[in-house]
From Swiss-Prot:
Keywords: ATP synthesis, Cell inner membrane, Cell membrane, CF(0), Hydrogen ion transport, Ion transport, Membrane, Transmembrane, Transmembrane helix, Transport. F(1)F(0) ATP synthase produces ATP from ADP in the presence of a proton or sodium gradient. F-type ATPases consist of two structural domains, F(1) containing the extramembraneous catalytic core and F(0) containing the membrane proton channel, linked together by a central stalk and a peripheral stalk. During catalysis, ATP synthesis in the catalytic domain of F(1) is coupled via a rotary mechanism of the central stalk subunits to proton translocation. Component of the F(0) channel, it forms part of the peripheral stalk, linking F(1) to F(0). It comes from Nitrobacter winogradskyi (strain ATCC 25391 / DSM 10237 / CIP 104748 / NCIMB 11846 / Nb-255). Its main location: membrane. It is found in: Cell inner membrane. It is a single-pass membrane protein. The keyword RNA-binding does not apply. This is ATP synthase subunit b 1. PANTHER family: ATP SYNTHASE SUBUNIT B (PTHR33445:SF1), ATP SYNTHASE SUBUNIT B', CHLOROPLASTIC (PTHR33445). The chain crosses the membrane at residues 5-25.
């Protein structure tokens, strides 16, 4: 049995393990493994924390984006309403302006028409007075003619004006 190499390998292995146990290599290996385990645990905790922070930041970004989108829609709606109000106000002002200008033009036309009628009547009265004067002066002579002429002229003027 001592002549077999496997036996010597087993004895050497047991002696080596005994020396390692005596020197305390197992404690060094275990403490190194414990440190590595703690470092990996810390890295995993950091990764979880970073993941949670990223999720919070993403949720915050999405909320701010939605808020900005709503605010933009509100601004657009308010701008449309303001534009419609301004357009309606401008239309009302334009209609009021056109109505006032039309009324003013109609007033000027009526005034011009009344003035034209008055001018025509005055011209007709002057023509009638001239015709009456001519007829009376040709047919009647003297003081009677002058009295009739003044009376006729005043009657014609009062009736035509």
């Amino acid at each position: 049995m001592l002549a077999e190499p496997e036996t010597w390998v087993a004895i050497a292995f047991l002696l080596l393990m005994g020396v390692f146990a005596y020197v305390g290599v197992h404690r060094t290996v275990l403490s190194a493994l414990d440190r590595r385990s703690a470092r990996i645990k810390n890295e995993l905790d950091d990764a979880r924390r970073l993941k949670d922070e990223a999720a919070k930041l993403l949720a915050d970004y999405k909320a701010r984006h939605a808020s900005a989108e709503r605010e933009a829609q509100d601004i657009i709606a308010s701008a449309r309403a303001e534009a419609e109000r301004i357009a309606a106000e401008a239309k009302a002002k334009m209609e009021d302006f056109v109505a006032r200008r039309t009324k003013s033009a109609e007033g000027k036309i009526a005034s011009a028409e009344a003035q034209a009628i008055a001018d025509v009547r005055a011209a007709a009265a002057d023509a009638a007075v001239a015709a009456a004067s001519s007829i009376l002066s040709n047919s009647v002579k003297g003081q009677l003619a002058d009295e009739l002429l003044v009376q006729g002229v005043s009657e014609v003027r009062s009736k035509l004006n």
